[in-house]
Each structure stands twice: as C-alpha cells, then as structure tokens.
Amino acid sequence: NLSAASTYQLLVIGYNRSDYDFASGGGATKRFNIGSTGNPATLANLYLQPVNPTVVPEFFSCFGNGYQGTTLVGPVFKPSQINYVTGTLKRLVSGLTLEVTNIPAYVNSMTLIAEQLVTATRATDGTALAWQTVGDSGTKTLATQAPVSGKVSFNQFLLAIPDSRKTLFYLDVSYGIFTERYTVKLPDTPGVVSGNRIIFTPNHWVKVTGSYANINIGFTLAGNINLDDNAWDGLQ
C-alpha cells in the first residue's frame, strides 16, 4: 500500500525472467544482483551488477509517467493524482560484435579478451558505478571460438564503459602448442575509439571487422550505432 500523503517516482527494471527471480531474491541461477553503493538506497546509487562481469544479461529500465485519464501528471506523483502509470523501457547495456575472416587452417581457436571492465551499472540510466578493483584489475576472457570456414564472430553484451575508463580488447590466437596475443587495433573515431580503446554508451552497438592478414596492423570500425529503436541486427 502507498501512503496517500507521500510523493512517488516509479522506476521499472526490465530483464529476462530466467536471469533473476524477484520473488526469491534472485534465485540460485540468477545472473545479476540488485544493490546500491550507499545506504539508504536511492535512485542515484541503485545498481545492477552481473554475477560474472564477462556474462552480461540484457537490462532495460525506465521511469513511469503517471496519468489521470488522458492527462499527463508526470514522473513524480501522489497516488491520488493518478489512475495508471506507463513508460517505455530503454536498453541499458551495450553490444560488441567482432568478426575476423580469412583465418588460416592452422589456427585452432581465437579468444576475445578485455581489460578494465565495468562491473555494475546504475539502474536508472546505465552510468558506470563500479569497475574491476585493484585486486581484480587483470584482463577478462569474454569468449573463445574455433574458426568455421575461416571465420570467427564474437557477439557480446557489455555494461556501458565511459571515456574515462575506455576498454582495450585483445585476441589470443592459438595454433598447435602456441598462443599469441594481439591488441585489437582501430583507427581513432571521436567519441568511440581513442588509442585503440573503445567507449560504450547505453544502447550502443559497435561492430569491428577485419581480415586475419591485418591482425597485427588494424581492423575496421564497421558499425557504430546508438539505436533508439532498441533493435540490434546480428546481436541476439
């Protein structure tokens, strides 16, 4: 029950039902936690935190707008002022697609690795609230693939990564008993890439493509889209 004398603002969080069981506090198979960086919890410090920083669920959120009939009251209201609430969820996470083609047959596998990952995002707008700590500051393995028809294609959800902590990616190439690490090199692009480090904003999809022959030279930024329609082609 809501107090009639109090004023409310309603935040709605969207996620895959199998990723979190709200009724049981998350459940044994939950993929993320809901918490806050301070006490009491407020909209400014409420966060969503993947259990595994390299396995990011798809998050959405929005503020509800209160209505009295067809009249918009707004996002802040008293219960007596409204008779229903509506809102449009917006994706909080970012996406990365990295494709490498023309991979020689002697390559057994390729592993995508990242450093300086964001570990918790603000529930209201996707702002980064926590990062890898000093004791956990190393690189993180995102995925490993064996080439198929000379190609690998990595598709990853990531928490939004601000310019101040933009992320460097690596590819570990394994062949026989040897593994070599290559930095994913990209041309500088304002607001997206600087010094090979990539910036991700909420609902932002970055696509990187390149031939194996250029793995030590540099790849191409083939896609850089901040989508308002919440539809990402190729990233499921």
Describe each model-derived feature in a short phrase.
Residues 41-47, 190-211:
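Low-complexity, Pro/Ser/Thr- and charge-rich linker/hinge segments at domain boundaries
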Residues 78, 89, 103, 160-162:
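Sterically constrained small-residue positions within well-ordered secondary structures
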Residues 1-92:
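Short, low-hydrophobicity acidic/polar segments
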Residues 199-236:
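Hydrophobic, glycine-enriched assembly/anchoring segments
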Residues 84, 95-97, 153-154:
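Intrinsic-disorder/low-complexity, polar/charged segments enriched in Ser/Thr/Lys/Arg/Asp/Glu/Gln
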Residues 1-26, 106-197, 229-236:
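Tryptophan-paired
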Residues 6-8, 83, 92-94, 108, ...:
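Residues at beta-strand starts and edge strands
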Residues 89-101:
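A short, Gly/Thr-enriched small/hydrophobic beta-strand-prone motif that recurs across taxa
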